[in-house]
Amino acid sequence: MFKIGDIELKNRVVLAPMAGVCNSAFRLTVKEFGAGLVCAEMVSDKAILYNNAKTMGMLYIDEREKPLSLQIFGGEKETLVEAAKFVDQNTTADIIDINMGCPVPKITKCDAGAKWLLDPNKIYEMVSAVVESVNKPVTVKMRMGWDEDHIYAVENAKAVERAGGKAVALHGRTRVQMYEGTANWDIIKEVKQSVSIPVIGNGDVKTPQDAKRMLDETGVDGVMIGRAALGNPWMIYRTVHYLETGELKDEPKVREKISVCKLHLDRLIKLKGEHVAVREMRKHAAWYLKGIRGNAKVRNEINHCETRDELVQLLDAFTIEAEAKELQDAKVG
């Protein structure tokens, strides 16, 4: 549907790079639901250069996920360039993305993430240095500005383009907003009109209809979906289908949700081992169960699970219980 450098995406729906979430197990699951591009969670440039074991694990890519964008962050040109070169030469990622959007203080105090948004000249300098050092296309994920008084989205996007960046993903919130308030799609539209490289819009795309509205109202090349896909890869499938056909597919049934949740669990166990995976899966299971009536009790029980068997037994028992309630409701209706 559109290209980032020489990488062709089959549609306009992109999975956002969410920290603590977008490992290979989650990305592959979302890819199977039709995402045109999946983005890995951000990785520290210095951690790559220190050969940190956990970080090296975060660079793992399953070939079935591709095309894939791998995101790095840092505040110093030398280390960012060296980390980008490592990713370029030692991973099968298709795209190298630079994080300029993370609003978390522990990132911004290191002059990384959203701190870049205050200086278009630094953006140009850093991006051009990375572009010159690697063969893979380089992109940037950014927010619209630091705060309401410092919104340099257009200048920053132009700096990325001038530096040789192949696309910009723009979240229509400031750093100060974090994830509160509403995303400003007008700024996204302005940025799209100001550069010739692809622009991917991000922020408040919660339904397939939102995705279409963003495309129509801003003219962006793609839509990036983040939190709406947590425990809900059907959001990706339903959005792709809606954009292609205009038809809105039904939400998944309980059994289908639990089945995919268990698949996700097993992939996470394969990736990280049972002990770590089960603990990490607690939050994912809560997301999968969201919106299913009567889930509070089982969500609480899941938070005490330590093994795969415990978690699967709880999920299976809840499925039977929830389906019985659905059947009862249907009879009453």
Model-identified regions with their sequence ranges:
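Active-site beta-loop-alpha junctions enriched in small/polar residues
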Residues: 18, 43-45, 73-75, 101-103, ...
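Hydrophobic faces of well-ordered beta-strands that scaffold small-molecule active sites
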Residues: 13-17, 38-40, 68-72, 96, ...
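Short, glycine/charged-enriched secondary-structure capping and boundary segments
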Residues: 29, 53-55, 85-86, 110-114, ...
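N-terminal small/glycine-rich loop or linker at the start of catalytic domains
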Residues: 2-14, 48-67, 102-112, 127, ...
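Alpha/beta enzyme core
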Residues: 81-112, 120-197
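Glycine-rich, positively charged N-terminal anion/phosphate-binding segment
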Residues: 1-3, 18-94
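Alpha/beta catalytic cores of nucleotide-metabolism and tRNA/nucleoside-modifying enzymes
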Residues: 1, 9, 13, 19, ...
